[in-house]
């Protein structure tokens, strides 16, 4: 076949596509393509081809070798090297022929630097006529070898070196040398029928071997026949034979037979290669490769380590001292060790040797984990590093692997890592040693101010050893800022002169080389007293190439000069431009380049191609490629300086040495050259010139532009539905950014929903955010910031429900749609792309029609979570940049809120952390815990300064308080717990005094009044005690005069007034001082908390569902506002704003409310907490953090612009009593602060339009959309009806009994009936048309439930049937016309909603235990029952039927919406909307729904296929189970008393399959 065609023909492209779909990279290696014939058959090319064969077998998991054998045996080359003994045998036989001996001696020179000495073939001099002499030389050597073989002086294998062709050498190396290579090899044999009859014809001679005189080479033909027979005998399974009839123009491409043969050959190649790939993949799947990535990572570092320590020498004293230190530290807590020294000093070799000797140093059961950082993808960043270490340690110790919830967030992985180390320590058995070499090569450390994941103290039996470079890189300085113990740092010093010489000798011996005395002197003259192993290795790499008969160039004296010398040598050998571009591309890549990628990139580089084809033209007129042989030659000379790193399942090339990277940047990537390299890489990874797109080039010998196909690999985002193009995802943004193609970056990456979804699904939300963090600082684009913040807001949904397309598209569209018009360039395009995707989505999906999730630019800055239990304490540190949290399981975490990650894990406590106090300008923290210890921490370093046993009472029945006060002036910390008060010196941790109280009357409140040097306590019985804060001596004791028979519940000190404000169980607030006490206020309920502003001018008291504000005055405090700040649930905590113009309050219903004090208590915003009672609020500047003991998550809000109007402004409803009119234009809800009024909110304008006075508190709201009526149900029992077109008018419906509060109301679907439900009474009224407004008549019917339980929900039908439910779960159908009540099957808990279908044949009911039932009203039995179980489920909130009654839309209290098929009970889709939906109102193709966040959801439900699988949207749900039960149709028909007319029911759209089994969908 024509050379070059197989490697780039259509079949290989098909194989490439096939492999990409399976996550594999397909690389064709044909080193003889694109080069001149003289180079194709030289000795170096042959050697490189054989090396490539070995590389293919080592690398490939599928096809590794393909041979195309025709009727040519090929040329036989003479050996390029002859061993000394073999040379002597040949010389002895040539002694009788002096001219032959002289010829051989002229071409071969003895290299005594080889071991053993070798005779090396010399290239002919310039201008010499070498071909005749070479032919003679070949004949002479072959005859000498033949004679030596006949006499038995050389072996058959040695003889073959003179008689084998290049083809046979390659087949021997790849196939015949082993019996187990059938799986990856294929040999195509071409046999031409009757060729022997035409063998002497001129046209046939082109197909066979010829001698120099043009005659047939019979010996070559015999050897070819022997080779074919050998292949057939050893590996018949790899053979594919093609028999062609003889033809004079057989090899003419226009010959149909020839074309058919080529097509068949290509098809066979594709089938064979694909089969080999699939076979191997099945074997890997069978072997269980879930943790293949981990095993590959471990093997990589072990292999690297074994390579490094082969030439290790010296350091024995340092190893011994390190071993002694490890044994000394093994039984106690200690700091990590850091080995440091200049680059190249031998730190890596020492770390690898230490890992090898660890079993001897600490015992044979020691678990050792070694990572050579930066040599693989997972060891290049902290996220991958910690993940791999955690998995390896868990497997080694038999511990559970990190769950998916931990792996979803890097902060959780960090905390899991710290916890894992302590778990291993507590086993008290095997020691664990973690060795992390080259901290400088860890991306997250290189430019960081700290190392947030680094344990500052190692527990017993856990050791952490790091290495770092000293010098200008700064990583060692970073470590020294966090690891303060000077004993932790161990300097690695240079080798001695003797050790340096020993190292060189070891390297030479490993390479089977030596140095002559002259060369040895030259080497050491260039390296006087050099003990730097890196510099020695550079010298060795040069010296190993010295032959004994050459005079080498003197070596450079410094490492930098040696690296420049290396580049100069490479340029002289391979050309300056090629070396500059190859090294430039490798260094410019983000993670490295595979060999296939590098060859593709070079094929796109016009400068390189013009330089390569300066003296000859490429072999093809259709395509243009870079000749791969040129790269392989350069790769061989790079050798030791080239590293291979496993990344995403591929092997990537990178520069192994920092010094060479710096030199490459200096020599080849200065100025515009850097942007050019990134530009070509961007072209490659974007696929600009792939898939047949041709690129113009002008070659020197052609002189005109050529438009040629470069045949580079295509670069789609997805290779298949499940395999993403990870290389493109990771490299393209980086190269677009650094090539200056910023608009393309914004359009193709940051502004592409396809890119965002692919990156998010394949790499997770953190990788996606990393891309935006990489690019955003270089882009002056507010739109990029909006998208980045929107992605950050998506994190809770992704962590809760898993990353998948519909979730990501919904999240971004519902958050960014608000800005689509104002920011059309990027945000508008993203929204359009999302809408287009939804239109084509094949699965059932809810399609957002507008924004309804919290948009970027709002107050929420972050939602963060940790790998710990609920949060019990919280405080801000240095300049409001650090947030310290304490948890139920005793963990203290210090968060950097600028970078939003944990910087320290403080693990001293064993019990729940109850209090944290920050002082010393935010740099120190005191913490108190249920374990009765106090800890003092340095927040900057994360170090524990001391621990104090506080000696609290262990009596669980005794009331416990945890109160800390830090007196910085006197350097004393006071703690109160139970009946004991302690004072400790902050510097020495020595006790200052102890005060013991009366166990029968324990203290409930304690304060240190610094201005009076007094310590004040209030006991349970109201006894006030005064103590000296300096000595602890009692100064006085008295009973409170202002309080009788109340127990203290909370207190806060007011230092300026010298008073303790104390709250009591019956609502009293008292001011207590050393002079006595005074009643400040009597509240209606028990005081739940007291807080004062920073300047102590304001006081807030929480009681029941309200907060009252007081203003400081001369007597203490007075009431600040006439109105109280009200919540819908019990208030839990509060905090004042920076300038006392705000107060932020939190309540039991997980809501946070922001009030303006400068506007007399105006509610500015309602914020959603973490889904649990808001028990903790902490302010740091303009930032407010909220948390709860019931959640491991916390939120951080920026309230600096709380007074600024937000666009769009959400409606502020906290009751959930919302109604909607005018197709979602207006929302109605009880007015904030005055529930006797209805607020009318204009959604388009984002403001209140009007309000309606109801004169009584509102209990429920309903809107008759068609009749334009608003119904308000009141606590008084009255229903007021407001015509929406004339709101000044009102219709009053009186209650049946005085003061009976309304529970709920319902309108029939035609809006002609109204049902009003009280505790146990239901009124049914008629609504008829009238002028100017509808007329409400009745009540037409009134009935009593006659049950002890109260009504919870009601639904009315046009025919006067009523479906109602009770608080205990009972459900009834009542026929008003006959006064009959029919009990339906009971729910297991309170029914939250009952809704009737539009055709009034079905009813859906939902209960608080998340059980939904679909009822057939005619049969009065449920058709389908669906239950939902999850760790987040809190029951059903609301439901409705679609307009066509095909679906049921359900809002759950876990802040999600589901769609349920009425036809067969199938769960179609679930959507997480971040907020509880108050009600759902159907529209023509979907629904609208107001949420507790103040937004109106507008969505269409799209189900393109009637048989669409409902499984796909649910596959990523975590810890959730749906179960659907269906009742057999015959049972329903029998219950209804109707004939089983299947067609009639089918016409109603209610057909269901008989014998339908229960459906169970388990979502893990």
UniProtKB/Swiss-Prot annotation:
Q: Which GO terms describe its biological process?
A: negative regulation of NF-kappaB transcription factor activity; positive regulation of gene expression
TM regions (residue ranges): none
Signal peptide positions on this chain: none
Q: What's any one GO cellular component for it? A: cytosol
**What is the protein's quaternary organization?**
May interact with HSP90AA1, HSP90AB1 and BAG2.
Q: What does this protein do?
A: May play a role in the control of androgen receptor (AR) protein steady-state levels.
Database matches in PANTHER family? NACHT DOMAIN- AND WD REPEAT-CONTAINING PROTEIN 1
Q: What is this protein called?
A: NACHT domain- and WD repeat-containing protein 1
Native species: Homo sapiens (Human)
């Amino acid at each position: 076949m024509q050379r070059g065609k197989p490697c780039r023909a259509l079949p290989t492209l098909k194989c490439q596509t096939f492999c990409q779909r399976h996550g594999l990279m397909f690389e064709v290696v044909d080193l003889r393509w694109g080069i001149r014939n003289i180079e194709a058959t030289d000795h170096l090319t042959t050697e490189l081809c054989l090396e490539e064969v070995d590389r293919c077998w080592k690398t490939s998991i599928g096809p590794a070798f393909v041979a195309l054998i025709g009727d040519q045996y090929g040329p036989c080359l003479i050996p390029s090297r002859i061993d000394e003994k073999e040379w002597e045998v040949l010389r002895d036989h040539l002694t009788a022929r002096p001219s032959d001996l002289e010829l051989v001696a002229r071409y071969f020179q003895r290299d005594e630097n080889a071991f053993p000495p070798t005779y090396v073939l010399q290239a002919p001099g310039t201008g010499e006529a070498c071909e005749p002499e070479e032919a003679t030389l070949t004949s002479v050597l072959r005859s000498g070898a033949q004679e030596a073989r006949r006499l038995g002086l050389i072996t058959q294998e040695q003889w073959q070196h003179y008689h084998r062709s290049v083809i046979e050498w390659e087949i021997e190396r790849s196939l015949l040398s082993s019996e187990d290579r059938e799986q990856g090899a294929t040999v195509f044999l071409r046999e031409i029928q009757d060729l022997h009859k035409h063998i002497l014809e001129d046209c046939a001679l082109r197909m066979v071997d010829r001698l120099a005189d043009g005659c047939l080479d019979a010996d070559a033909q015999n050897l070819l026949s022997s080779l074919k027979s050998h292949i057939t005998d050893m590996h018949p399974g790899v053979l594919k034979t093609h028999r062609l009839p003889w033809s004079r123009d057989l090899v003419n491409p226009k010959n149909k037979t020839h074309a058919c043969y080529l097509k068949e050959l290509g098809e066979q190649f594709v089938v064979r290669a694909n089969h080999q790939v699939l076979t191997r993949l099945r074997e890997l799947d069978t072997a269980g490769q879930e943790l293949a990535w981990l095993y590959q990572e471990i093997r990589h570092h072990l292999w690297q380590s074994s390579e490094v320590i082969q030439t290790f020498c010296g350091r024995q004293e340092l190893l011994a001292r390190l071993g002694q230190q490890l044994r000394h530290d093994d039984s106690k807590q200690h700091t990590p060790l850091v080995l440091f020294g200049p680059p190249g000093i031998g730190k890596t070799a020492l770390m690898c040797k230490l890992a090898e000797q660890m079993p001897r140093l600490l015992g044979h059961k020691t678990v050792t984990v070694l990572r050579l950082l930066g040599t693989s993808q997972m060891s290049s960043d902290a996220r991958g590093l910690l993940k791999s270490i955690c998995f390896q340690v868990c497997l080694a110790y038999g511990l559970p692997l990190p769950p998916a919830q931990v792996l979803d967030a890097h902060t959780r992985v960090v905390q899991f890592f710290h916890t894992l180390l302590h778990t291993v320590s507590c086993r008290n058995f095997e020691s664990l040693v973690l060795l992390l070499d080259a901290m400088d090569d860890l991306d997250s450390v290189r430019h960081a101010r700290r190392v947030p994941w680094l344990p500052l103290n190692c527990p017993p039996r856990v050791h952490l050893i790091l290495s770092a470079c000293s010098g200008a890189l700064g990583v060692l300085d970073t470590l020294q800022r966090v690891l303060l113990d000077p004993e932790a740092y161990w300097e690695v010093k240079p080798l001695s002169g003797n050790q340096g010489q020993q190292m060189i000798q070891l390297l030479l011996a490993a390479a089977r080389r030596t140095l002559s005395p002259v060369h040895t002197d030259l080497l050491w003259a260039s390296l006087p007293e050099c003990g730097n192993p890196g510099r020695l290795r550079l010298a060795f790499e040069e010296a190993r190439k010295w032959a004994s008969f050459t005079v080498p160039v003197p070596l450079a004296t410094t490492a930098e000069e040696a690296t420049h010398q290396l580049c100069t040598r490479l340029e002289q050998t391979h050309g300056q431009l090629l070396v500059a571009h190859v090294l430039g591309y490798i260094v410019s890549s983000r993670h490295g380049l595979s060999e296939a990628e590098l060859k593709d990139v070079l094929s796109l580089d016009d400068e390189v191609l013009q330089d390569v084809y300066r003296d000859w033209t490429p072999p093809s007129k259709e395509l243009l490629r870079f000749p791969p042989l040129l790269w392989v030659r350069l790769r061989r000379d790079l050798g030791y300086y080239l590293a291979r790193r496993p990344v995403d399942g591929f092997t990537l090339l990178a520069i192994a040495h920092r010094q060479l990277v710096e030199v490459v940047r200096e020599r080849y990537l200065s100025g515009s050259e850097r942007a050019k390299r990134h530009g070509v890489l961007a072209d490659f990874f974007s696929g600009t010139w792939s898939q047949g797109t041709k690129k113009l080039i002008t070659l020197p010998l052609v002189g005109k532009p050529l438009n040629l196909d470069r045949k580079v690999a295509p670069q789609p985002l997805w290779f298949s539905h499940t395999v993403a193009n990870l290389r493109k995802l990771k490299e393209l943004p980086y190269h677009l950014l650094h090539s200056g193609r910023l608009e393309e970056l914004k359009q193709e990456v940051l502004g592409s929903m396809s890119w965002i979804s692919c990156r998010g699904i394949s790499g997770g939300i953190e990788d996606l955010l990393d891309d935006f963090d990489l690019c955003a600082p270089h882009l002056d684009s507010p739109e990029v910031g909006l998208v980045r913040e929107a992605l950050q807001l998506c994190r809770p949904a992704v962590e809760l429900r898993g990353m998948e397309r519909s979730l990501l598209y919904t999240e971004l569209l519902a958050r960014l749609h608000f800005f689509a018009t104002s920011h059309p360039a990027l945000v508008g395009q993203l929204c359009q792309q999302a809408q287009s995707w939804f239109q084509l989505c094949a699965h059932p999906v809810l399609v957002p029609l507008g924004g309804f999730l919290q948009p970027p630019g709002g107050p929420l800055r972050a939602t963060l979570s940790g790998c710990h239990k609920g949060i019990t304490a919280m405080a801000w540190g240095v300049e409001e940049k650090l947030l310290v949290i304490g948890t139920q399981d005793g963990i203290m975490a210090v968060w950097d809120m600028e970078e939003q990650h944990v910087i320290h894990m403080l693990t001293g406590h064993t019990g729940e952390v109850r209090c944290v106090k920050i002082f010393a300008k935010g740099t120190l923290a005191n913490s108190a815990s249920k374990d009765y210890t106090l800890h003092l921490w340095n927040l900057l370093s994360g170090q524990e300064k001391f621990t104090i046993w506080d000696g609290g009472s262990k009596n669980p029945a005794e009331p416990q308080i945890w109160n800390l006060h830090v007196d910085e002036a006197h350097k004393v910390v006071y703690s109160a717990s139970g009946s004991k008060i302690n004072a400790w010196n902050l510097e020495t941790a020595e006790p200052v005094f102890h005060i013991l109280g009366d166990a029968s009357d324990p203290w409930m409140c304690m304060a240190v009044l610094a201005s009076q040097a007094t310590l004040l306590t209030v006991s349970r019985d109201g006894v006030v005690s005064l103590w000296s804060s300096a000595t602890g001596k009692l100064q006085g004791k008295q009973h409170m005069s202002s309080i009788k028979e109340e127990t203290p519940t909370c207190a806060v000190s007011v230092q300026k007034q010298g008073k303790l404000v104390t709250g009591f169980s019956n609502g009293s607030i008292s001011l207590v001082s050393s002079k006595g006490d005074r009643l400040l206020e009597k509240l209606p309920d028990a005081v739940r908390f007291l807080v004062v502003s920073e300047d102590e001018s304001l006081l807030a008291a929480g009681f029941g569902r309200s907060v009252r504000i007081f203003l400081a005055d001369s007597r203490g405090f007075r009431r600040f506002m006439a109105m109280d700040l009200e919540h819908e649930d019990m208030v839990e905590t509060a905090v004042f704003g920076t300038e006392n113009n705000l107060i932020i309050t939190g309540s039991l219903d997980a809501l946070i409310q922001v009030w303006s004090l400068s506007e007399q208590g105006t509610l500015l915003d309602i914020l959603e907490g973490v889904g649990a009672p808001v028990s903790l609020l902490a302010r740091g500047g303009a930032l407010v953090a909220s948390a709860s003991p019931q959640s491991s998550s916390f939120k951080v809000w920026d309230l600096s612009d709380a007074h600024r109007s937000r666009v769009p402004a959400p409606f502020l409803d906290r009751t959930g009593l919302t109604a909607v009119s005018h197709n979602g234009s207006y929302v109605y809800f009880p007015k904030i602060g005055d529930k006797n009024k209805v607020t009318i909110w204009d959604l388009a304008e984002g403001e209140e339009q009007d309000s309606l006075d109801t004169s009584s508190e509102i209990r429920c709201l309903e809107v008759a959309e068609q009749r334009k009526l608003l119904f308000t149900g009141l606590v008084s029992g009255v229903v007021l009806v407001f015509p929406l077109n004339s709101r000044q008018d009102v219709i009053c419906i009186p209650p049946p009994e005085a003061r009976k509060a309304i529970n709920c109301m319902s309108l029939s679907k035609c809006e002609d009936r109204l049902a009003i439900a009280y505790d146990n009474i239901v009124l049914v009224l008629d609504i008829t048309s009238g002028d100017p407004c509808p007329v409400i008549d009745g009540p037409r019917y009134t009935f009593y439930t006659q049950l002890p339980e109260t009504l919870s929900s009601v639904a009315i039908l046009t025919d006067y049937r009523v479906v109602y439910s009770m608080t205990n779960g009972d459900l009834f159908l009542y026929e008003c016309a006959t006064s009959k009540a029919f009990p339906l099957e009971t729910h297991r808990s309170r029914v939250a909603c009952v809704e009737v279908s539009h055709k009034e044949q079905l009813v859906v009911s939902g209960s608080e235990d998340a059980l939904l039932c679909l009822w057939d009203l005619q049969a009065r039995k449920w058709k389908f029952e669906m239950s939902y179980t999850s760790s987040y489920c809190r029951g059903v909130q609301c439901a409705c039927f679609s307009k066509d009654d095909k679906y049921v839309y359900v809002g759950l209290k876990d802040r999600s919406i589901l769609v349920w098929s009425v036809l067969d009970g199938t769960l179609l889709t679930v959507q997480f909307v971040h907020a509880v939906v108050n009600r759902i109102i159907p529209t023509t193709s979907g629904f609208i729904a107001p949420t507790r966040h103040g937004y109106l959801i507008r969505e269409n439900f799209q189900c393109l296929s009637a048989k669409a699988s409902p499984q796909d949207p649910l596959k990523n749900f975590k810890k959730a189970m749906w179960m659907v039960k269906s009742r057999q149709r015959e049972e329903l028909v029998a219950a209804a008393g109707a004939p089983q007319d299947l067609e009639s029911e089918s016409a109603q759209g209610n057909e269901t399959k008989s014998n339908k089994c229960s459906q169970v969908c388990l979502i893990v």
